Each structure stands twice: as structure tokens, then as C-alpha cells.
Amino acid sequence: MVVTAAYGTDQVRQAGGQRAMLPVIAGAGADGVEIRRELFSHDELLTLPALSETIELLGLLACYSAPAALFMPDGTLNPDLPRYLSEASTLNALWLKVSLGHFNDKQPLEALRALLNASGMALVVENDQTDCGQLAPMQRFKAACRVMALPVTLTFDMGNWLWVGDSPEEAARHLAPAVSYIHVKAAVAHNAQFRAVPPDHADARWLDLLNQLPADAPRGIEFPLEGADLMAVTRHYVNLLREE
């Protein structure tokens, strides 16, 4: 999977939106694309059926990412979740991805089960760069889903653990069985924080980490894709991740 945001907001906008990036992604030999809700204008959100048609014509799979938390600060389910699930269905996405948010207890999970059953859409929850994306709450959520046999799996963002002060390797040890999608990126120290870089621009830690995660989980390229020939750059990393 190639995450459209890997090309940068400005590049996507200048190209004419996410739809304009699809031939690059397909031409690079990728299996699919992660469409990002935050990169849509209001008008573009109204053209999801046409975007879905283009994705299908190019032979790509799709997943859909909404920049939203599953749980609100008071612990309730995000009231916009049905809208995001519906948009994902319109795209014929394989799954909807959100961040965890403020997960406190199992009480809202039956309502979540009902929503997912009604929509027929798979849901994956990602560790983000907030306190809610730390290992401890992600573990609690994983355990609650297991106890309740809730069909929700995890997106493992390889780099985000560093932003929240956790060990990516420890996170992999605890969460790997529940991981169904991997956001691949390396991270290096930058101005007292971190920045995402391609895995072949960093040390072997990141490819070692990838080997701790399920081999059959789709891999999403979320590190910066830059250069004069974006198709060639994308193809390089699609091939790199297929080989690992």
C-alpha cells in the first residue's frame, strides 16, 4: 500500500488531488493505496464514487484513513464514526483506519460491534503520536477486543512509538498478534524530536522491527516519497518492502 500523504500535502494538491496520484502508485507496481480523508477538500469528498471507480480501473486495492479518534475525551464513541464507515464503504475500502483516542472501559464496545455489523466495514486502530497512542492504552484496547471477541485489529505505525517515548520493539512483542496493517517508516532524531525517513536511509533497526511483525500484514509506505521521478521512487520502495 502507498499512503497518499507520503507525497506531501503540497505535492498532492499541486498534482490535482489524491486521484491524480493513483496512476503513479499503480505504475509503480503497488498493490493498493491508502486514501487520506484530511487531504480532501469539501468538494472532493463529494466525488468518492468517482475516486473509487478510478481505483478499481487501475487495479488497486484501497483502504481509508480518517484523522479521528475512535473514542472521545469522555470515553464515548466518536459520533462521526458512522460517517467515516459510510465513506469507506463508498470507496470500496478494505478497512477504515482511525486512532484510538480516550479508551477507558469496555462499555462502548457493544455499540461499536453493532456499528461494524451494520456497516460491514473492517476497522483498524493505529498508534498515533499522542498519549492515547502509547503502548499501555493500546494494550488495554487489544485485550478488551480479545475478551469481547470484537473484530477490530491494529495498525502498527513503526515510527510513532518514538514520538510517545515507547520502544517499537517492545510494542511489537506485545501487539504483533493483533496487527493486520503496518505503517512502514523509520525515524531519526531531529531538533529534539523525530522525523520520518525511508528505511534504507536509517540503520537496520527498522527492517529488523518489520521482521517482528506479521509477514502477511499489508505494508503501507508512509515515509516521504520525493524526487523528480515519483513513479521510480515509489517503485524502488514498493520493491524494497516486497523483498523484506
Where are these regions (language model features)?
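Short, electropositive alpha-helical surface patch
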Residues: 51-62, 115-122, 215-216, 231-244
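Histidine-acidic metal/acid-base catalytic patches
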Residues: 1-6, 10-29, 89-92, 135-156, ...
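A structural signal for alpha-helical segments
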Residues: 43-46, 104, 170
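Active-site-proximal loop/turn and secondary-structure-junction residues that shape catalytic pockets
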Residues: 6-8, 37-39, 68-70, 100-104, ...
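Active-site acidic/histidine proton-transfer and metal-coordination neighborhood
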Residues: 54-62, 70-153
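Conserved beta-strand positions in the central sheet of alpha/beta enzyme cores
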Residues: 34, 63-64, 97, 124, ...
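N-terminal pre-domain/capping segments
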Residues: 1-82, 89
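Short secondary-structure transition/capping segments
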Residues: 45-48, 75-77, 108-111, 136-138, ...
